[in-house]
Amino acid sequence: MASISDIHQQLISKQRSAVEITQEALENINQLEPKLKSFICVTAEKAIAQARQVDAKIAAGEKIGLLTGIPIAVKDNICTRGIPTTCGSKILQNFIPPYESTVTQKLVDAGAIILGKTNLDEFGMGSSTENSAYQVTTNPWDNTRVPGGSSGGSAAAVASAESVVALGSDTGGSIRQPASFCGVVGIKPTYGLVSRYGLVAYASSMDQIGPLSRTVKDSAILLQAIAGYDPKDSTSLNVPVPDYTKNLTPNLRPKGQIRIGLIQETFGDGLDSSVLQAFTKAVELMQELGAEIQVISCPRFSYGLPTYYVIAPSEASANLARYDGVKYGFRASESENLLNMYAKTRSEGFGSEVKRRIMIGTYALSAGYYDAYYLKAQKVRTLIKEDFDKAFAKVDILACPTSPTTAFKLGEKSDNPLSMYLSDLMTIPVNLAGLPALSLPCGFDQQGLPIGMQLISNVLKEDLLFEAAYVYEQANNWYKFQPQL
């Protein structure tokens, strides 16, 4: 499937209609879903109706924006009015939001065509999209492997051309890690840049919505559309949104003007040799293109994982307390009384990983352990942010592999939660610090599985990430490779 800019040109030149483009996406979905299972819900009739409206505008001579008529997939933890939003959980089965999230409202206003809702690990808790109550999504490059998580459905949909672009959410790597595993581009924006109104909360101090796409430019265009201040979100940043496509040129700034720091702590045990090799070649190419490369130490980087697994479950245990079967979603039957109904509903409605994190969070927040765990984790979080601040005094961008490995086999880590958690080792510290980070393809391993490189910048420097990522992308052909489906 073509890029946003290519489809836009096809529409305004009347080479193709919005209905034809939407039908092509829906045909891809019908053909591939039995294998991939990227979508929980496909809104075919609604999508065709939206496409007809776009064609009517074009026929009437109205000027259309870049996203008008572009098929897009939305992760199923982002509320969509009139369309089920399950969060991949039994406890929200058949829940249809009565309101629209800010990001999807912006997309609808821009004329984008929503194809449906994509699969995810339940409430965003997972790194493989195996924790969904409804189905297991597979990797388009190898159907015996995971697509990553928790935005695995969105990443798989984009990689397989079921959708042009997609929205995901990222709490500890849930956009970037699946982007790496599926060979696409994914960006987690600065915390507060994109409104969280209508995003079902997991860990509110880290959750952030962002784009997934096949090219850097498409991610820049999509972020441009969804970013900006929203009074409905108390953590929304009231800052101007720059033109993210303005500096997208194939040439890097004059030699030495962009300084890239390689995070020393990311090259230890557990890093696959194929991932290290691909990343090293990518860094060498960036140096040839004019970047100044140096090694940077972030001493507390490795503390990110244990810190996250105290703070995120603590916030989740509070956020998920609202699901009790009273007003919406699943309700257990044959309860003896109200308290029994609460307990049965939550016991039957939540999956094992969600229960595990609720229990960890409740324990960390309990009276006897609050200071020892939660408060201490918040202090370490501050130290991690300080390490990043010191690093950005020396460099403009930090770089490391997105994940220590390529996509692992389905079921390989299901019985080993700690091994699963380690796949987000490189991405989690970024969320703790509220920084923006982008993953883009930088090669393949010996089995033909994609490898991702992560670029991290200081707050609100997404334009710099896009600029550097675009230069690298255009200097090679990784983004042109497609899975053979």
From Swiss-Prot:
It catalyses: L-glutamyl-tRNA(Gln) + L-glutamine + ATP + H2O = L-glutaminyl-tRNA(Gln) + L-glutamate + ADP + phosphate + H(+). GO terms for biological process: translation. Keywords: ATP-binding, Ligase, Nucleotide-binding, Protein biosynthesis. The active site is at K75, S150, S174. The keyword Ion transport does not apply. PROSITE patterns: AMIDASES (PS00571). One of its GO terms (molecular function) is glutaminyl-tRNA synthase (glutamine-hydrolyzing) activity. One of its GO terms (cellular component) is glutamyl-tRNA(Gln) amidotransferase complex. It holds the Pfam family Amidase. It is an enzyme of class 6 (ligase). Its EC number is 6.3.5.7. The keyword rRNA-binding does not apply. Belongs to the amidase family. GatA subfamily. Heterotrimer of A, B and C subunits. PANTHER family: GLUTAMYL-TRNA(GLN) AMIDOTRANSFERASE SUBUNIT A, TRANSAMIDASE. Allows the formation of correctly charged Gln-tRNA(Gln) through the transamidation of misacylated Glu-tRNA(Gln) in organisms which lack glutaminyl-tRNA synthetase. The reaction takes place in the presence of glutamine and ATP through an activated gamma-phospho-Glu-tRNA(Gln). HAMAP family: GatA. This is Glutamyl-tRNA(Gln) amidotransferase subunit A. It comes from Trichodesmium erythraeum (strain IMS101).
